[in-house]
A protein has these predicted regions:
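Short, solvent-exposed amphipathic alpha-helical segments in soluble enzyme
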Residues: 9-11, 98-106, 128-129, 151-159, ...
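Internal, active-site/partner-interface "lid" segment
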Residues: 40-74, 230-256
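Glycine-rich phosphate/diphosphate-binding loops that line cofactor/substrate pockets in enzymes
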Residues: 71-81, 128-131
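Peripheral docking tails and interdomain loops at the edges
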Residues: 181-256
Length: 256
């Protein structure tokens, strides 16, 4: 176990969570470990139910991504995009940054990647777009937030500067577009985590991070392979490592 876990497990003011061994991925970039830590933190902070029902829904959605998006992922990789922009609002902004990081890590920096919020991207960051750029928008399940997401999505498609603009959503009732991928549960929006015949409570944006990130991780892995790299260890120079080296942990509140 890591030093921080060992310290926290014996501290009265800390709450340490030990994840199962299956979450301890062995590759360079964190994939299952990221998902495991995110879900564990969400449950620990009571942002996701601890009874396992919601987690099971999210697991099914993740499996749906891997089963149904292979053709789309393969098509994106064949396009050989040199830049990728991920967009997300609220919690999905953090996911956009994580998705961009995965692309950077697994392609050893050969694919320039940016993670931004839709409103922020409208300003200076938008200049990164060119014909070799893929834009992936993680659409919010919040009705108000989604209106801003869709406005920018329409603007980017209207501008026709980026090579391709796609959107991921968990909602069926959105403006139809060939580049909108619907990650629906059991073939329909919402799925069912309640009584028979009762519509499931919509997933929160925090919960959506988990199936959305599977798409981003798979895209980064396949793009890495297309560049002739080894996804488990793409950085041949050894300048970055799976576990950061040479970091000192200093006593908190010590001399300034």
């Amino acid at each position: 176990h890591g030093e921080l876990y060992r310290r926290a497990s014996s501290a009265r003011s800390a709450y340490a969570v030990l994840l199962p061994e299956a979450c301890n991925d062995q590759s360079f970039a964190m994939t299952s470990s990221f998902s495991g830590m995110l879900l564990a933190a969400a449950v620990a902070l009571r942002l996701v139910s601890a009874d396992g029902t919601r987690a099971a829904r999210l697991a099914r959605l993740g499996a749906h991504v891997l089963a149904s998006c292979v053709a789309e992922l393969t098509s994106l990789v064949r396009a050989q995009f040199e830049r990728v922009v991920y967009l997300g609002s609220s919690e999905l902004k953090g996911l956009a940054r994580e998705a961009a990081l995965k692309m950077l890590e697994l392609t050893d920096g050969k694919v320039v990647s940016v993670g931004e919020a839709p409103l922020g991207f409208r300003h200076g960051p938008k200049t990164v777009l060119d014909g070799s750029t893929l834009v992936v928008a993680f659409l919010s399940n919040d009705a108000y937030t989604r209106r801003y997401d869709l406005d920018l999505l329409a603007e980017l498609r209207r501008d026709a500067v980026a090579g391709r603009v796609i959107a991921l959503t968990n909602r069926m009732h959105l403006p139809e577009h060939s580049d909108t991928l619907v990650l629906a549960e059991d073939g329909a929006a919402g799925g069912a985590d309640g009584a028979a015949g009762t519509p499931a409570e919509p997933l929160t944006d925090l919960e959506l991070c988990l199936p959305y990130v599977v798409f981003a991780q798979a895209l980064a892995m396949l793009r890495s392979l297309s560049l002739g790299l080894t996804p488990d260890s793409p950085n041949a120079a050894g300048t970055v490592n799976r576990v950061v080296q040479g970091v000192s942990i200093y006593p908190y509140g010590g001399a300034r």
